[in-house]
């Protein structure tokens, strides 16, 4: 397997403040769980050979049922998540160790980013083939204030949001996780981890529509954008 998508669906979605307590990745948009929308995109991409999903333990059976219901292909395994996002990603990587001799490219993506496109995945893979990694970014659309000791306004033209997918060769990202465990460091994402350990990163631009569903506002934005895509595909407008 040359390319394996590692989809993180292990979050509890506390910032969504859901009365039901259901994790955000299982919320429905167009009568389909958000995680399934995301998995469909990767399963239909010609360059993705297999998919590993990291999921909350108590929802693994539900995910198995949804994958069967919507006929999602290329699933290698569903892995139990850890206490943190970083530990969850490592659990996914650990399940891929059997392919380590091939040293596949690992396409790390959030299960709650269902608006990633095939073209954006392809651009990331092309960059990773040439340079060893690829980090998705989008242009900052609002002014950013940096405030550590003395507040300063950053030049928005030089600011970007770091998003996903983030693509690394297996051995590189696995070794980075091992170093982070040894040093007892927790990072917000793989790009931050790689940067901390001095790895040169390469960037590919994606659309600002590649939203990570974190808050109720994000849910309504993603829902509206997906409905707009459906209308466009039907009527060509």
UniProtKB/Swiss-Prot annotation:
Enzyme Commission number: 2.7.7.-
Broad class of enzyme this protein falls into: transferase
What does this protein need as cofactor? Answer: Mg(2+)
| Site-annotated residues for Transition state stabilizer | 15, 24
Kindly give the Pfam families that the UniProt entry links to this protein: IspD (PF01128)
**Annotated pathway, please?**
Capsule biogenesis; capsule polysaccharide biosynthesis
Instruction: Decide whether keyword Transferase is in the record.
Output: yes
Q: Which InterPro entries match?
A: IspD/TarI (IPR034683), IspD/TarI_cytidylyltransf_bact (IPR050088), ISPD_synthase_CS (IPR018294), Nucleotide-diphossugar_trans (IPR029044)
Q: Which UniProt keywords apply?
A: Capsule biogenesis/degradation, Magnesium, Nucleotidyltransferase, Transferase
Q: Name one GO biological process term.
A: isoprenoid biosynthetic process
Q: What does this protein do?
A: Cytidylyltransferase involved in the biosynthesis of capsular polysaccharides. Catalyzes the formation of cytidine diphosphate (CDP)-6-D-fructose from cytidine triphosphate (CTP) and D-fructose-6-phosphate. Shows less than 1% of activity with ATP, GTP, UTP and other sugar donors, such as D-fructose-1-phosphate, D-glucose-6-phosphate, alpha-D-glucose-1-phosphate or D-glucitol-6-phosphate.
> Which family does the entry's similarity section mention?
Belongs to the IspD/TarI cytidylyltransferase family.
Question: Which protein, by its recorded name, is this?
Answer: D-fructose-6-phosphate cytidylyltransferase
Give the species. Campylobacter jejuni
Gene from which the chain derives: HS5.18
């Amino acid at each position: 397997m040359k390319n394996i998508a590692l989809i993180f669906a292990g979050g509890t979605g506390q910032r969504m403040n859901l009365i039901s307590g259901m994790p955000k990745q299982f919320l429905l948009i167009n009568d389909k769980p958000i995680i399934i929308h995301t998995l469909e995109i990767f399963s239909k991409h010609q360059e993705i050979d297999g998919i590993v999903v990291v999921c909350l333990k108590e929802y693994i059976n539900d995910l198995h049922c949804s994958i069967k219901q919507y006929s999602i292909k290329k699933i290698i395994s569903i892995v139990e998540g850890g206490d943190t996002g970083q530990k969850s990603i490592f659990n996914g990587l650990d399940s891929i160790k059997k392919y380590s001799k091939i040293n596949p490219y690992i396409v790390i993506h959030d299960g709650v980013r269902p608006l990633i496109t095939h073209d954006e995945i392809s651009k990331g893979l092309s960059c990773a083939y040439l340079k060893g990694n690829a980090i998705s970014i989008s242009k900052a659309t609002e002014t950013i204030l940096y405030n550590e000791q003395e507040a300063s306004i950053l030049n928005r033209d030089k600011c970007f949001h770091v998003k996903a997918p983030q693509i690394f060769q297996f051995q590189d990202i696995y070794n980075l996780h091992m170093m982070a465990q040894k040093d007892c460091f927790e990072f917000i994402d793989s790009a931050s981890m790689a940067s901390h350990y001095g790895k040169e990163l390469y960037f590919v631009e994606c659309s600002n529509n590649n939203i990570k569903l974190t808050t109720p506002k994000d849910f309504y934005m993603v829902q509206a954008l997906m409905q707009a895509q459906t209308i466009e595909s039907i009527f060509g407008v």
